[in-house]
Amino acid sequence: MSIMRSIMSNRLVRWSREYPELFITWCVMTYTFGVAGYMLGQRGLLVQHEDQVRIPSKNAHPWEDTKSSSGKSDESLDYSYKYYPRGDRSKEPRKAPSAIQYSTFPVKGVSEEVLERFSK
């Protein structure tokens, strides 16, 4: 066993003297994978994100408009997105602009039949 150790240590020493830049890289990579293995062994891969969520009790979702004029149930709620101007919660939330932009332009030189087929 001691003979095998001396052979292996001599090979490692010779290799490290011949390729010093690779030896340093090998040491850094060994250390990195060792720390990563230790951390994964300690914490595991099970993360429960639901435990870390904190929902504020007052006005948590500004896009849910609970001030319905008719007093109806959830069908009358306005769920369009709203935001606080500059993140200031003391101001009234504003309605955000629509994400869908429509543009119309005239089409020339195309028959009505083709227009009807592609306008659906």
From Swiss-Prot:
The chain crosses the membrane at residues 19-41. Residues 57-78 are annotated as: Disordered. Keywords: Membrane, Transmembrane, Transmembrane helix. It is a single-pass membrane protein. It comes from the Eukaryota. It is found in: Membrane. Its main location: membrane. GO terms for biological process: mitochondrial proton-transporting ATP synthase complex assembly. Residues 61-75 have a biased composition (Basic and acidic residues). InterPro entries: C3H7.08c (IPR039965). GO terms for cellular component: membrane; mitochondrion. This is Uncharacterized protein C3H7.08c. It comes from Schizosaccharomyces pombe (strain 972 / ATCC 24843) (Fission yeast). The lineage of its organism: Eukaryota, Fungi, Dikarya, Ascomycota, Taphrinomycotina.
